[in-house]
Structures are given as C-alpha cells and as structure tokens.
C-alpha cells in the first residue's frame, strides 16, 4: 500500500469530532487517561527507561501518552493524521510546558527521513483504525534503531471483546462514544504476531489489560483475550 493511502478518512473524521474533549479527564477519553499510567510504566520498564531517549508516538491523537513520556524525560515526536487532535495536543503541551514535536504525517511517509532514528516507537490503539496494519508495523520497524523497542496495543477479536468493548464500554457504560470501535477490525494476538514476524522485530513480551467497572480501575493481566500490548525489539 502506498505510504499516503494507508488512512481511513472515516476514522480520522471520527476522532476529529471528539478532539475538543481529549484532555477532559471525565470526558470521552476518560478510559485512555485511566489506562495511560499502566502503558507508560510498561513502556518505561520494558525499554530499560526512556529518559533521554528519542521516542516516536505513532497515532498520538491529542497527546496523552506523548506528554506522559516527555514528562519523564523522553525526547518525543508525536505523529498523527488528524489535524484537530494535533492542535489540541500542541496547545496542551504549550499550556503545561512540555516540549514535544507534533507532526501531521503517516508512519510510512515519516519513515523516509527517519530510518533507524528512534530508540523507542509506540503505536497504541492505532492498528485497528488503519486499512493496512502490516504497512504501519513495517514502518515502525524501519524507524527504530537496531536493538530498539517497538510497542503495539490493540484489541483481540472474539465474543468477549465484542461484549466488553462495544456492548459494555460503548452502549451500557457509555465510557466511549458509540461507533468508536469496529469489531471486524480488531486483531487477534496470533494475527499481530504473524504481522510482526514479517519484519525484523522480535516479540519479547505480551501483556493483557483488564478493566473492573465496579472499581473503575485498569490492571495488568496475563490474559490477552481483550485489550493487550506487545513489546517487540529490532534485531541487531
């Protein structure tokens, strides 16, 4: 797929409409704010610390993960194709005094001048929103240095994930706007591993994340049956 075509305009428009609520801790992106500390800790611990390292956040949206990585000393570039979320991210970084370079571009196009440039690349909750996940994974691989880490997170495709993330989170609990997710675009761990195997990345770890609606708390779980993350490392 061409580097400038791996974009779904409907997905971009969906997140453009929600951009103004990105930093509302009780708004439509509340789940991401609750989830972010777990993601940040997993990335920082697995990569051996990101302080002083060059990090690319692919599909950064309004900058929740990007800002948290910058606050602990990473040199962060945020990449997204949504202009409204990027403007929100830039403004919030300015207001909070965090230095981040936000760029409107696809991973495939950004790769052209950033091959083996980053120590760490993150691609969280993004693969299920693009037409060609393999293309994004390859671009992430190409942009990380040998020995560097690439992190992916997405949602497993099964009955349980449909019930929890769409019926539960969107319709019953109203944690997310209806239509945020398309179950057909969810990616099974075996499928993601197969895509990773087509690159120079090696899967080092996989970890699930579960949500308790009674306590409102996310926590790690060894089960990857719904939300999950994988850590990969580029072969030297």
Swiss-Prot record:
<dbReference type="Pfam" id="PF13489">
    <property type="entry name" value="Methyltransf_23"/>
</dbReference>
<dbReference type="InterPro" id="IPR029063">
    <property type="entry name" value="SAM-dependent_MTases_sf"/>
</dbReference>
<dbReference type="GO" id="GO:0061542">
    <property type="term" value="F:3-demethylubiquinol 3-O-methyltransferase activity"/>
</dbReference>
<feature type="binding site">
    <location>
        <position position="39"/>
    </location>
    <ligand>
        <name>S-adenosyl-L-methionine</name>
    </ligand>
</feature>
<comment type="pathway">
    <text>Cofactor biosynthesis; ubiquinone biosynthesis.</text>
</comment>
<keyword id="KW-0808">Transferase</keyword>
<protein>
    <recommendedName>
        <fullName>Ubiquinone biosynthesis O-methyltransferase</fullName>
        <ecNumber>2.1.1.222</ecNumber>
        <ecNumber>2.1.1.64</ecNumber>
    </recommendedName>
</protein>
<feature type="binding site">
    <location>
        <position position="124"/>
    </location>
    <ligand>
        <name>S-adenosyl-L-methionine</name>
    </ligand>
</feature>
<feature type="binding site">
    <location>
        <position position="80"/>
    </location>
    <ligand>
        <name>S-adenosyl-L-methionine</name>
    </ligand>
</feature>
<comment type="function">
    <text>O-methyltransferase that catalyzes the 2 O-methylation steps in the ubiquinone biosynthetic pathway.</text>
</comment>
<comment type="similarity">
    <text>Belongs to the methyltransferase superfamily. UbiG/COQ3 family.</text>
</comment>
<dbReference type="GO" id="GO:0010420">
    <property type="term" value="F:polyprenyldihydroxybenzoate methyltransferase activity"/>
</dbReference>
<dbReference type="GO" id="GO:0032259">
    <property type="term" value="P:methylation"/>
</dbReference>
<dbReference type="GO" id="GO:0102208">
    <property type="term" value="F:2-polyprenyl-6-hydroxyphenol methylase activity"/>
</dbReference>
<feature type="binding site">
    <location>
        <position position="59"/>
    </location>
    <ligand>
        <name>S-adenosyl-L-methionine</name>
    </ligand>
</feature>
<keyword id="KW-0831">Ubiquinone biosynthesis</keyword>
<dbReference type="InterPro" id="IPR010233">
    <property type="entry name" value="UbiG_MeTrfase"/>
</dbReference>
<keyword id="KW-0949">S-adenosyl-L-methionine</keyword>
<keyword id="KW-0489">Methyltransferase</keyword>
